Amino acid sequence: MFSSIARAIIGTSNDRALKAYRRRIAEINGHEAALATLDDAALQGKTSEFRDRLAAGESLDRLLPEAFAVCREAAKRVLGMRHFDVQLIGGMVLHDGKIAEMKTGEGKTLVATLPVYLNALSGKGVHVVTVNDYLAKRDAGWMGQLYNFLGLSVGVIVPGLEDDARRDAYAADITYGTNNEFGFDYLRDNMKYALADMVQRDFNYAIVDEVDSILIDEARTPLIISGPSDEPTELYNQVDGIVKQLVEDPDTYDKDEKFKTVNLTELGSERVEQMLSEAGLLTEGNLYDVFNVSLVHHTNQSLRAHTLFTRDVDYIVKDGQVIIIDEFTGRMMEGRRYSDGLHQALEAKEHVTVERENQTLASITFQNYFRLYPKLSGMTGTAMTEADEFDEIYKLAVVEIPTNVPVARKDGDDEVYRSADEKYEAVAALIEECRQRQQPVLVGTTSIEKSEIISNLLNSRKIPHAVLNARFHEQEAAIVAEAGAPGAVTIATNMAGRGTDIKLGGNLEMRLKTELERLPESARPAREAEIRAEIEAAHDIVHAAGGLFVIGTERHESRRVDNQLRGRSGRQGDPGASRFFLSLEDDLMRIFGSDRMGPMLEKLGLKDGEAIIHPWINKALEKAQKKVEARNFDTRKNLLKYDDVMNNQRKEVYAQRREFMRAESVADVIGEMRADTIAQMVERRIPEKAYAEQWESAELAEDVKRVFGLELPVVDWAAEEGIDESHLRERISEAVEAHMAAKAANFGPDFMRFLEKSILLQTLDHLWKEHLLALDHLRQGIGLRAYGQRDPLNEYKAEAFALFTAMLEDLKEQVSSVLAHVELGSDPATAPAPAFDPASMFTSHPASGPYDGVALAEPQPTLAPEMAVSTYRAESVDPNRPETWASTPRNAACPCGSGKKYKYCHGRVT
């Protein structure tokens, strides 16, 4: 009560922000009259003037009023559009590094031109991030006319571009592209071997369109670059046949729909063990013995595929492939795959070809990618419901921009029915009623399956309609363009991120484009006049009928997605209406609704075939949605804490990598690595203050031979009177440095510099890839530490740091060893530089958590073909004598027989 009184007196924080922005509008408008008198050349000259003023020390904030006014004047001349005052506010919000919430149809694309123009004046580049390639190309071409008029260059990043074209696009003042393309280019750049090969420049400023979709809905899933693995795929089909039989009995597993988890019961474990044994897959021990970990993994993923994932809801099968469906947009996510073997389990379930798993080479989440920009802003029609998350994770404030014309849409209360069939009948009846008065209808569904239920129902009633879901992705633009025509009925699987407005009467631009290009030039003017008249007449009919009627057939988990659907109606002051039809069988009502909802509705008078309309229901549903949103926020926040550990290590590795590439020579770094490696060897075999008889001098000689390929009289040196560990270290160092100096003299200084740098970079890449896998495995099991009363996050941080430290120690030893062993089989001048090979890699954005591991293979660092490395393996390791295991190379299998690498087992850093 008191908070509402306070808001009424002093206003909300949003009101106060708008008040401050409105004060600047008068200043911007004050330039309009003078700029209107300038000819085109004088107006275009303003860009050079602004750049000179920036170079002289003036700030972008000081330039803002005049720069915005220049951009508006240019838009009037080039695009025939003038920014409204509320659009100026939106532009200022974006320039200030905030999120502008603007309703559908309020001209977000035009709003973005203001801060884009202003920030591009610095020459440091502006990235405009869209949700799909169509919008990136459309907006770059459309708004590019304005930027080119003002003397700014525009680039666009789309799939399939060669590196030279990408580099040119990033070098432009303004670059349009999708979130995926920007992120993948960042990862690819950090896998290259020369700065000149990179395509991106330093980050400056990004504006993210549909910011809620990219930074919230897709925040949990990482971008991954991977290479092919040698793992066989037959086991997926074998396990699938067993699990398919198992799940016929619901007592064999426990499923939690709320948290989307499934586990075998005790009965299920016994049954699956028996079936695996009968199939010859489980040959010794029980299912949960350490050497059967692969079987457990395959069984769990197959169980998830059969019980948690539904065809035509979570994925579709098209052209022999399992294609994921985005739960927020209903789009096919072609090219994306679930990670950690889940996609292979789905392929086995659907009897299509099981593709090999891929091994992760590099990955990053959108949360961490977009936090790399010094300045970030975004725009969307629905952000206020997630304002807390934007603020806490991205430090982005949300400002709700008022509409230019008040919203005239009428939002009806939800209608609740007992069963889904009753609900669909009511939806069909309302559609028929709307068609009789020629009112267009947009029906929103949450899955392909449900859109086809409604489509079949309308077909039985002979009601013509269009279906917009992942199956008909190609016809999307044409379907949306006609969705506002008189009497049109369109069924859509979620309208989030569709990017195309539904205009009352039909889309004039789309019709002109599609119809006129088929006609000869002479016939076009007459047909254009006819189309314009038809669209105008249709607009009047639809306007009189009440505008677009949006029908929601189910509440989504997120209020934001419901608001996006509603927002398709009532754009720019048009009339419209919306209503949601629900049933007690809907997922949200069934899983998250209160157990008391059913009995309460009966008390309110809910009967078969009738609907209940009551404000209490709306409040109860909103409460359920808030509960789900809070849970999802906590999940994302928790995942970010874990990902931040990897992110800090990633930033360190990538920064170090760039330092190596930037350096003329890395000889000093390599020299320090050799010195550290020798010091570690000596320290391990001759601990400080140890007696001479405790020295492991023979083992030290073995280490030197294994790492550096040198047979030194270490045992004899150690037997000398008065020698200590520092003298031993110096003698070994002198011998190793003499060996390396002779090698450098043989190779020549130029080639030695090239060799040192390429081996250093390739070894770092190889170890980083291994480290990513180790972190994945660590993350998967770390939650169990909670049972031991230990904080999993703190445990993860400590162990991840130990793994990172071990990786850096491995780097020193491996680089030193490879350089010591490398020999040339031909003239050094002909040896090629290490190559970055994108053709052998895959980009993916899997629809699962960023820590779902992928089984990685174990390739060695790739050297140039003419370099032959002679390796040495210590022969003194005896699996039956643990005291000899210390000579085991850190990346070799542990002699204990666990199957793990030595460095993760008995050689683990503690």
Swiss-Prot record:
Q: Which residues are involved in binding ATP?
A: 87, 105-109, 501
First-tier enzyme category under EC: translocase
Q: What is its main location?
A: membrane
Task: Enumerate the Pfam families for this protein.
Answer: P-loop_SecA, SEC-C, SecA_DEAD, SecA_PP_bind, SecA_SW
- Residues bound to Zn(2+) are 894, 896, 905-906
UniProt catalytic activity: ATP + H2O + cellular proteinSide 1 = ADP + phosphate + cellular proteinSide 2
Protein EC: 7.4.2.8
Q: How does it sit in the membrane?
A: Peripheral membrane protein
Cofactor names: Zn(2+)
Q: Which InterPro entries match?
A: Helicase_ATP-bd, Helicase_C-like, P-loop_NTPase, SEC_C_motif, SecA, SecA_CS, SecA_DEAD, SecA_motor_DEAD
Extract the Gene3D superfamilies matched here: 3.10.450.50, Helical scaffold and wing domains of SecA (1.10.3060.10), P-loop containing nucleotide triphosphate hydrolases (3.40.50.300), SecA, preprotein cross-linking domain (3.90.1440.10)
Question: PROSITE patterns this protein is in?
Answer: SECA, SECA_MOTOR_DEAD
Please provide one cellular component term from the Gene Ontology annotations of this protein: cytosol
CDD domains documented for this protein: DEXDc_SecA (cd17928), SF2_C_secA (cd18803)
- Keywords attached to this entry: ATP-binding, Cell inner membrane, Cell membrane, Cytoplasm, Membrane, Metal-binding, Nucleotide-binding, Protein transport, Translocase, Translocation, Transport, Zinc
Subcellular location(s): the record lists: Cell inner membrane; Cytoplasm
| Cofactor remark | May bind 1 zinc ion per subunit.
Q: Which GO terms describe its biological process?
A: intracellular protein transmembrane transport; protein import; protein targeting; protein transport by the Sec complex
Q: Which domain of life is it from?
A: Bacteria
Q: Which family does it belong to?
A: Belongs to the SecA family.
Q: How does it assemble?
A: Monomer and homodimer. Part of the essential Sec protein translocation apparatus which comprises SecA, SecYEG and auxiliary proteins SecDF-YajC and YidC.
Q: What the protein does? A: Part of the Sec protein translocase complex. Interacts with the SecYEG preprotein conducting channel. Has a central role in coupling the hydrolysis of ATP to the transfer of proteins into and across the cell membrane, serving both as a receptor for the preprotein-SecB complex and as an ATP-driven molecular motor driving the stepwise translocation of polypeptide chains across the membrane.
Spell out the protein name for this chain: Protein translocase subunit SecA
Q: Which gene encodes it?
A: secA
